[in-house]
Amino acid sequence: TATVGVAPRIMGYAPAPATRKILARTGLSLSQMNVIELNEAFAAQALAVMRDLELADDAANVNPNGGAIAIGHPLGASGARLVTTAVSQLHLTQGRYALCTMCIGVGQGIATILERC
């Protein structure tokens, strides 16, 4: 798991540097992620993060079951929802790695990588 802080005025951007930090820490690459669960605080925020990470706007492995806009953003449980959804998708697709990332109010971001055993 990796956490970062950015200026509060760009709080939604924090998943991008958090993702880069966890990838550097693990020696993995974004292309190795079979599933990416990016919490959508709002649509523009998710697109900004995806574009910064050089992911296609319609990347099939990003929120493959829909993101927070489609299935909900349970305040206080968003991280648990991301991880549960990612684990389920890894088992369904027999994938190996999942990235879960989200922004946190006032300029924080978090990212974690899961490996299916």
Which role does the model predict for each range below?
Residues 1-117:
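Claisen-condensing/thiolase-fold acyl-transfer catalytic domains that form or cleave C-C bonds
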